[in-house]
UniProtKB/Swiss-Prot annotation:
This is Aspartate ammonia-lyase. The gene is aspA. Homotetramer. It comes from Haemophilus influenzae (strain ATCC 51907 / DSM 11121 / KW20 / Rd). It catalyses: L-aspartate = fumarate + NH4(+). It comes from the Bacteria. The keyword Lyase applies.
C-alpha cells in the first residue's frame, strides 16, 4: 500500500502536488503524464531522444559554468549527472510522458531539467526535490528555452539514429552485393512493363539492388547534415534573451565536443527557431529510402511467385505456413512486412509535411508529432533492413534452369538480331513466334535470315551475358 510518506511535495505555477519520492522527475512531468494519455508510448521508449536532450543539458552547463551564468560547483554537478545518464543509462526510464504532447516539447524539456537536477542533487549529497540547492529551471535550464533546447536535442537524436539506420542499410547492401557475385553467371530474362525485354544475369539484377541502397546511404548522409545546424542559444524566439555575452558560440562549441558531431550555430536564430524545413528534407530522404526498398521487395515477391504458376526464378527462405485453408502454401512474408513498413514511412512523411507547415510566426509547436514520426520511421526502417537480410536475402537461391528456359524460349532475344537482320525483320520474326508458338531460332532459320552457325554465335550465352560482345560475325 502506498502511503503519503512515499511522496515529496513539489510546487509549480498551478499549485502543490505529491510526487513519488523515488522519482527523478517532478511536478511538471507529473502534469504532463496526466494531461497526455494518447499512445502509451513514452519518451523513455525513445532513449536516443533522451540522450540528445541530456547532451544539450551537459553542453549548456559547461557554457553556463564557464561564463559565470551559474555557480561552477552546480555546473559540475549537472555535468556529472549528465555523464552518468549518458555512460550508464541511469534514469533513461524516468521519462514517462507520452510522445504525443502539446506545448512544443515543453514537457520533454521540463522532464529533462527535473531528472538532471535531482540526479545532480543526489551526487552532492542532497535529496531529490531540494530545488533551493540545484533548481531545474534556474540552473539546469539556465540560458535556455524549450524552443532551442528541445529542437537541438531532437536534431542530435535524429542524426545519431540515422547513423544507425545507415549502418543497417549497408548491412542489407552487403547481402545483395554478395548475392550479385554468387549469381553473376546465371542468365535470365529482363522485363519491362512486365513483358519480356532482353536477357541479363541474375547477378546484374541483384547488383542493381545493392547499388540502389548505396545511393540511399549517400543521400541520407548528405541530408542528415542539415540537422547539425542548431538554434541553441536562441532561447524563446531567436533573440538570445537571457543569455550571457558569447554564449551561443561557446555552447555550440561545447555541444560539438559533447556529441562528437560537427554542430554549428544556425545562420539566423529567429529563422531557425520558427522553421522546420530540415525535418521535411530529412524525412523526405527516409521516404525515398522506403520507396526504393519497397520496390525491391515487390521484385522479390514477383520473382519468387509460384511455385507452379508464377515466375519461380528465385526461392525465398520458407519461414512459416502461409494459409489456414490451402495446404502446403508458403508466402513471402518478410518482403511483405517490409512493404508495410515502407508504407508507414511514406505516411509519416505526410505527417511531417503537414506538421512542418503548421507553425505560426516565431515558433512551430508541432515538433512533438514530427519527432514521433521521424523516430518511428527510422526505427522501423532500421529493423526492416536487418529483418530483410537475416530472414530473406541471405537465404535466396536461384532456379537456374527456369531462368535460362525463359531466355531461350522468349521472343525478346530477337532484339539481339537487330544489327544483323534489321528491326523490320525482327518485328516479323517476333510476330510469327507469338502467333505460332515457335521459337526465334526456328523462325529465323525458316526464313533464311541467318545461318545456324551465325545464330549460335549471336545467341551464345557469352554474347547474351555481354551484349557488347560482337561475336564472330563482326570479326
Amino acid at each position: 500500500m502506498i502511503t503519503m510518506t512515499q511522496f515529496r511535495k513539489e510546487v509549480d505555477l498551478l499549485g502543490e502536488r505529491d510526487v513519488p519520492a523515488e522519482a527523478y522527475w517532478g511536478i511538471h512531468t507529473l502534469r504532463a503524464v496526466e494531461n497526455f494519455n494518447i499512445s502509451n508510448v513514452t519518451i523513455s521508449d525513445v532513449p536516443e531522444f533522451v540522450r540528445g536532450m541530456v547532451m544539450v543539458k551537459k553542453a549548456t552547463a559547461l557554457a553556463n559554468g564557464e561564463l559565470g551564468a551559474i555557480p561552477s560547483d552546480i555546473a559540475k554537478a549537472i555535468v556529472a549527472a549528465c555523464d552518468e545518464i549518458l555512460t550508464t543509462g541511469k534514469c533513461l526510464d524516468q521519462f514517462p510522458s507520452d510522445v504525443y504532447q502539446g506545448g512544443a516539447g515543453t514537457s520533454v524539456n521540463m522532464n529533462t531539467n527535473e531528472v538532471v537536477a535531482n540526479l545532480a542533487l543526489e551526487k552532492i549529497g542532497h535529496k531529490k526535490g531540494e530545488y533551493n540547492v540545484i533548481n531545474p529551471m534556474d540552473h539546469v535550464n539556465a540560458s535556455q528555452s524549450t524552443n532551442d533546447a528541445y529542437p537541438t536535442g531532437f536534431r542530435i537524436a535524429v542524426y545519431n539514429s540515422i547513423l544507425k539506420l545507415i549502418d543497417k542499410i549497408q548491412y542489407l547492401h552487403d547481402s545483395f552485393d554478395n548475392k550479385a557475385k554468387e549469381f553473376a553467371n546465371i542468365l535470365k530474362m529482363g522485363r519491362t512493363q512486365l513483358q519480356d525485354a532482353v536477357p541479363m544475369t541474375v547477378g546484374q539484377e541483384f547488383k542493381a539492388f545493392a547499388v540502389l541502397l548505396e545511393e540511399e546511404v549517400r543521400n541520407l548522409k548528405r541530408t542528415a547534415g542539415l540537422l547539425l545546424e542548431v538554434n541553441l542559444g536562441a532561447t524563446a524566439i531567436g533573440t538570445g534573451l537571457n543569455t550571457p555575452q558569447g554564449y551561443t558560440e561557446l555552447v555550440v562549441k561545447h555541444l560539438a565536443e559533447v556529441t562528437g558531431l560537427a554542430c554549428v550555430p544556425a545562420e539566423n536564430l529567429i529563422e531557425a527557431t520558427s522553421d522546420c524545413g530540415a525535418y521535411v528534407m530529412v524525412h523526405g530522404a527516409l521516404k525515398r529510402t522506403a520507396v526504393k526498398l519497397s520496390k525491391v521487395c515487390n521484385d522479390l515477391r514477383l520473382l519468387s511467385s509460384g511455385p507452379r504458376a508464377g515466375l519461380k526464378e528465385i526461392n525465398l527462405p520458407e519461414l512459416q505456413a502461409g494459409s489456414s485453408i490451402m495446404p502446403a502454401k508458403v508466402n513471402p512474408v518478410v518482403p511483405e512486412v517490409v512493404n508495410q513498413v515502407c508504407f508507414k514511412v511514406i505516411g509519416n512523411d505526410t505527417t511531417v509535411t503537414f506538421a512542418s507547415e503548421a507553425g505560426q510566426l516565431q515558433l512551430n509547436v508541432m515538433e512533438p508529432v514530427i519527432g514521433q514520426a521521424m523516430f518511428e520511421s527510422i526505427d522501423i526502417l532500421t529493423n526492416a533492413c536487418v529483418n530483410l537480410r537475416d530472414k530473406c536475402v541471405d537465404g535466396i537461391t536461384v532456379n537456374k534452369e527456369i531462368c535460362e528456359n525463359y531466355v531461350f524460349n522468349s521472343i525478346g532475344i530477337v532484339t539481339y538480331l537487330n544489327p544483323f537482320i534489321g528491326h523490320h525483320n525482327g518485328d516479323l520474326v517476333g510476330k510469327i513466334c507469338a502467333q505460332t508458338g515457335k521459337g526465334v531460332r526456328e523462325v529465323v532459320l525458316e526464313k533464311g535470315l541467318l545461318t545456324e552457325e551465325q545464330l549460335d554465335d549471336i545467341l551464345s550465352v557469352e554474347n547474351l551475358m555481354n551484349p557488347t560482345y560482337k561475336a564472330k560475325l563482326n570479326k
